[in-house]
């Protein structure tokens, strides 16, 4: 048990705040909405924003961060007749929640205006308040249809627009329809939950913001300022500057109160399994053999049921959608058995894949205290209003300290004691923290890494920028400010870069030039034809001396940009196909169209829309799929149409888990035949290569396992497919270490696998800090073979995105740094046998536990010349 002590409030009456920070008009409106006091961090953030600074507020969950941008925006609206604001949220639920918050202030302004017109007077400027009363706030995102979007663009009083990065990406090519009215008067841009925009997604969003600023500059508005909110990370100011280009001041010390928070780390009890004859279980099933403790899902369900019976409202965080539905079902089962039917229907689930109407209804019930426990994925980790909660339950140790604090912060949002129960799963990392629980709460905040100068991403975004506004070659300096390296970037990369002038960019591309800045290299690549791209995306227009997007290109450049890094095409549909057929629907001819979707939803036949990213890991034939409405078994899949057909399934406490395998193949034979030094070199005492690989992930079959009762997780049966189902097959870039025999011979044969696994784990863990990406942007594999020559093993670290986005290139360039950092980290980690902070991190990391000395020996061999 760990206790985070209560924190007292640092606040002041809003009346006492300097009028240059909060105007008299704003104070009056705040009183109308029930705000009489303001926290110290809110006052500081508002002060900085109102003096023209860009600000990032990184105080804890439930500290009132939204007021830090609501008040500056409303002050702008009141004081500047044409001012506009743009707010971006990562989740639709957050957007709608905040629209309601803004609307409360607008309604209060209307009441003030009405009261003053009826003879009441105050020492305020009624004209300013009238501007706010007439202000419209609009949500423009994927849920808005074409008619709604056209009305939003046309409205003169639509001064606050709420959207998300995905929708903004498609707003920019239509900037002329928004015009100077919006982009020319855009004063403040808000980015909520900035910490989640890291890695490839964050780098994409950073380039999106540069395109946004470029459009604003076109309308005479080069300096819109940013207000960002973030969870606790190690580098909030640096991260937001990299995202927005703006020098940013950080407000991190919270003035909001919080009650005691008790963290409890719970390790499920060991199971005493026995056969029906009374003896010990003996099984050839490795999954069953590994399950020696009670199911964490079952333990979570017991905790939630007990909390509900004691009137304690809670959230339960789980990893997957299937787990979400399973835990909810088990909680209801427990409550029904205990004759608590009045509580059973107040247990709900919340996850991705629900319809807009379902999400809104759940949010409404949650905020009005009609739900006593909600089982959810990370979709609720971020700050929509969840009402008054007393506890959180976490199935598994959250991956980062920020996630744990964000999730636990959803309960006990102001006063009183709250509880966070972390239930350990049966894996080495969770077991490690059960042995050394104090380390769980001492984990340092993580850094957020992005790279807006990633050359591969620039080659995607620069054509978008050129289509939005051509590059004026007579005045390219502003574009260089947006997209090129600045002095700090060059110093950080410790490399001499060459910047090209306009003539050099268009010079004949006779050879690959070394040390070009990423912006110059991307421009040079985009203005020259190749065998793959016979029409260069960017063309020179001599009469205007501009660089334009070539409309002859078949691909719309905006379609080529995948902001969230999901490269696997459109999503899948799971469609209910009753055994007897249904009202004449021809299932064989179903196509994914809006009309078909509306028809299926009306008849309640569209079970779920599923994201495309490895959807077949969930939609193989035989898969059991649970939703809020029921349980279904997948009977058929149509890969061409991306539709899976299912039937209703009489749930019997079983679920399915795919048996996934992976294969990685080197495609560049020249790499392993010692071709150019650029792609194959000796680094310290290790052979390091860079090349193209093919990654295949496939489902070989599945396990049926029991999810109810304390023995949840026990395998019941296994199914093998005659032909494995390919769920991902793509070409990408990879860095690989060839470990020669003389290195492996120094390691005892029984320890070789654990040693190589430990080396892989620590290198992948460090890759994000070197390639400025997220842990999820790179993956790894090991392959034992005789290829490349003289090597028994190859460690691969590859880009998870098809065709790669330059991460492996960066790692190859910095291979010495990567290996030296790995050796230093293992040597200086205070653990004795290996821990999640060194060799036991990541997928399968626990199998390296106990091998620290061997890993250290191997890294010493690899780095000693």
Question: Where are the regions a protein language model picked out?
Answer:
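ATPase nucleotide-binding modules
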Residues: 476-479, 503
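Donor-sugar nucleotide-binding helix/loop cap in glycosyltransferases
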Residues: 497
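Extended Lys/Arg-rich polyanion-binding regions
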Residues: 418-420, 426-443, 451, 456-464, ...
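Short cysteine clusters
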Residues: 829-838
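Short, non-ligating residues that shape and space the ligands of small metal-coordination modules
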Residues: 844
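Helicase motor core with emphasis on the C-terminal RecA-like subdomain
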Residues: 1-33, 37-40, 44, 50-66, ...
């Amino acid at each position: 048990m760990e206790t985070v002590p209560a924190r007292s409030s640092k606040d002041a009456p809003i009346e006492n705040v300097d009028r240059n920070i909060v105007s008299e008009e704003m104070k009056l409106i705040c009183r109308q909405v029930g705000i009489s006091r303001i926290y110290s961090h809110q006052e500081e953030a508002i002060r900085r924003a109102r003096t023209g600074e860009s600000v990032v507020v990184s105080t804890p969950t439930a500290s009132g961060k939204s007021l830090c941008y609501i008040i500056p925006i409303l002050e702008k609206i009141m004081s500047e007749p044409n001012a506009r604001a743009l707010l971006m949220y990562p989740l639709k639920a957050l957007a709608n929640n905040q629209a309601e918050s803004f609307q409360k202030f607008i309604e209060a302004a209307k009441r003030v205006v009405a009261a003053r017109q009826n003879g009441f007077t105050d020492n305020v400027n009624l004209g300013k308040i009238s501007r706010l009363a007439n202000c419209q706030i609009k949500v423009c995102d994927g849920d808005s249809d074409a008619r709604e979007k056209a009305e939003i663009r046309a409205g003169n009083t639509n001064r606050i627009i709420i959207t998300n990065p995905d929708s903004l990406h498609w707003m920019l090519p239509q900037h002329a329809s928004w015009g100077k009215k919006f982009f020319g008067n855009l004063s403040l841009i808000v980015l909520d939950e900035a910490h989640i925009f890291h890695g490839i997604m964050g780098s994409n969003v950073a380039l999106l913001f540069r395109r946004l600023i470029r459009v604003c500059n076109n309308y005479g508005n080069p300096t819109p300022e940013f207000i960002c909110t973030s969870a606790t990370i190690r580098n909030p100011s640096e991260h937001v500057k990299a995202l927005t280009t703006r020098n940013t001041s950080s407000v991190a010390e919270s003035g909001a109160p919080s009650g005691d928070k008790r963290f409890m780390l719970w390790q499920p009890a060991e199971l005493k399994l026995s056969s029906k004859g009374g003896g010990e279980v003996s099984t050839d099933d490795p999954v069953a053999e590994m399950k020696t403790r009670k199911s964490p899902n079952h333990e979570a369900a017991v905790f939630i049921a007990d909390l509900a019976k004691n009137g304690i409202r809670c959230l339960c965080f789980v990893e997957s959608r299937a787990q979400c539905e399973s835990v909810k079902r088990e909680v209801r089962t427990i409550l029904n058995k205990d004759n608590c039917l009045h509580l059973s229907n107040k247990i709900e689930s919340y996850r991705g894949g629900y319809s807009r109407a379902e999400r809104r209804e759940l949010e409404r019930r949650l905020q009005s205290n009609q739900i006593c426990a909600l089982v959810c994925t990370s979709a609720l980790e971020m700050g929509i209003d969840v009402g008054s909660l007393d506890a959180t339950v976490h199935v598994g140790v959250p991956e980062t300290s920020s996630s744990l604090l964000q999730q636990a912060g959803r309960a006990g949002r102001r006063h009183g004691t709250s509880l966070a129960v972390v239930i350990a799963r049966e894996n080495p990392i969770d077991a490690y923290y059960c042995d050394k629980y104090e380390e769980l709460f001492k984990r340092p905040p993580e850094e957020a890494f992005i790279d807006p100068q990633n050359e591969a991403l620039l080659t995607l975004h620069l054509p978008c920028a050129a289509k939005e506004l051509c590059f004026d070659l007579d005045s390219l300096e502003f574009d260089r400010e947006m997209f090129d390296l600045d002095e700090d970037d060059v110093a950080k990369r410790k490399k001499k870069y060459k910047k090209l002038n306009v003539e050099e960019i268009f010079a004949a591309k006779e050879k690959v030039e070394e040390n070009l800045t990423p912006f110059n290299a991307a421009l040079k690549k985009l203005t020259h034809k190749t065998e793959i791209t016979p029409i260069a995306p960017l063309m020179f227009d001599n009469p205007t001396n501009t660089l334009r997007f070539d409309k002859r290109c078949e691909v719309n450049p905006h379609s080529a940009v995948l902001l969230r890094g999901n490269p696997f095409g459109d999503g899948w549909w799971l469609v209910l196909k009753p055994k007897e057929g249904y009202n004449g629907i021809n299932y064989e001819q179903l196509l994914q169209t809006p009309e078909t979707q509306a028809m299926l939803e009306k008849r309640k036949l569209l079970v779920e829309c599923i994201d495309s990213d490895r959807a077949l890991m969930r939609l193989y034939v035989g898969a059991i799929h649970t939703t809020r409405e029921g349980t279904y078994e997948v009977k058929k899949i149509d890969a061409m149409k991306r539709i899976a057909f299912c039937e209703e399934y009489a749930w019997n406490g079983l679920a399915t888990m795919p048996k996934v395998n992976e294969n990685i193949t080197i495609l560049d034979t020249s790499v392993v035949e010692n071709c150019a030094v650029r792609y194959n070199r000796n680094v310290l005492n290790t052979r390091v290569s860079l090349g193209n690989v093919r990654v295949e992930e496939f489902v070989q079959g599945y396990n049926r396992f029991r999810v109810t009762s304390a023995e949840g997780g026990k395998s019941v049966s296994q199914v093998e497919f005659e032909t494995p189902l390919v769920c991902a097959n793509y070409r990408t870039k990879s860095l690989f270490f060839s470990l020669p025999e003389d290195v492996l011979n120094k390691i005892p044969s029984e320890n070789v696998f654990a040693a190589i696994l430990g080396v892989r784990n620590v290198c992948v863990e460090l890759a994000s800090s070197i390639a400025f990406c997220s842990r999820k942007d790179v993956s790894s594999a090991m392959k034992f073979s005789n290829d490349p020559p003289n090597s028994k093993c190859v460690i691969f670290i590859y880009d998870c995105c098809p065709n790669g986005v330059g991460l492996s290139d960066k790692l190859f360039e910095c291979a010495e740094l990567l290996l030296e950092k790995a050796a230093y980290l293992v040597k200086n980690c205070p653990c004795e046998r290996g821990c999640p902070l060194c060799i036991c991190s990541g997928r399968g990391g626990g199998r390296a536990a106990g091998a620290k000395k061997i890993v250290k020996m191997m890294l010493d061999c690899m780095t000693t010349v």
